[in-house]
Amino acid sequence: MKWAMIATWRMAIDGITEGSQLLKEGKRAGEAVETAIKMVEDYPFYKSVGYGGLPNENCEVELDAAYMDGDTLSIGAIGGIRDFKNPISIAKKLSEERFNCFLVGTGAEDYARKNGFERVNMLTDRAKQYYEKRKRETIEKGLSPYAGHDTVGMIALDCNKKMVAGTSTSGLFMKRRGRVGDSPVSGSGFYVDSEVGGASATGLGEDLMKGCISYEIVRLMREGYHPQEAADKAVSDLNDKLTKRRGKSGDLSVVCLNNKGKFGVATNIEGFTFSVITEEQKPTVYLCENENGKTTYEPASEEWLEAYLKRIKSPITFD
């Protein structure tokens, strides 16, 4: 197989469809990943990534992103950046640096400003409304504020056998100021090696980091595991370890792709979705189920896809 792209969640389908056009034209995986993730970041109804992303406890949007080149193993990452558009592009630029390639907070913002990245207020009116609703529910109904942590994570393989991984997220909803999860952390939120393959994770970053899960999947693929076997084993093993040692495990979901274009996916939750497109397969959204440590999936129906769009665009109401 010449090229392929896989990403976490339904929200990535339009992005990987656009990115695949570049791969068809012989463009590089990095360009495809950046283009695809920027589309997710720019869509205001995706409330866990980029513009319109859900804010922290102080109603500030802090964004994390990362980019990794599977040929050189170069990494660029940012954490807790505010008021800059398209953090994936900032991370990609940072991957060109020999030193200082992971910047956070004001340091990341200074770097973005000096390198001409667009400054934008990333907090939308809709996100503020959602914040106020959840704040009220937290106080009045005792609901957990930490709901909403859906990272877009992506891996691409191009016609030159180069592989790239990218991530972008606004992180845990109503998180403490300065909190950073797994998404920009190499080996946890992402990892890619063009000689083997790549993986990316989404879910509760605090738990995903406890298993360095993306690196573990790539390691298993290097040992000869099929991507699906590697994904299932990594998620099942970490879920079991956390349950045994801590009494419970947070949400753990992963996607992976090897350097031959074969993909895998695994989750320990209900409702995980992913998006994939290859030279041989049209862009498809899949719905996942997990039973006894094995993940299965089937294409989303047109009815499900229509209901999804209706749900994410529905007005925010206060009881």
Predicted regions and their residues:
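Alpha/propeptide regions of enzymes that mature by internal proteolysis
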Residues: 1-319
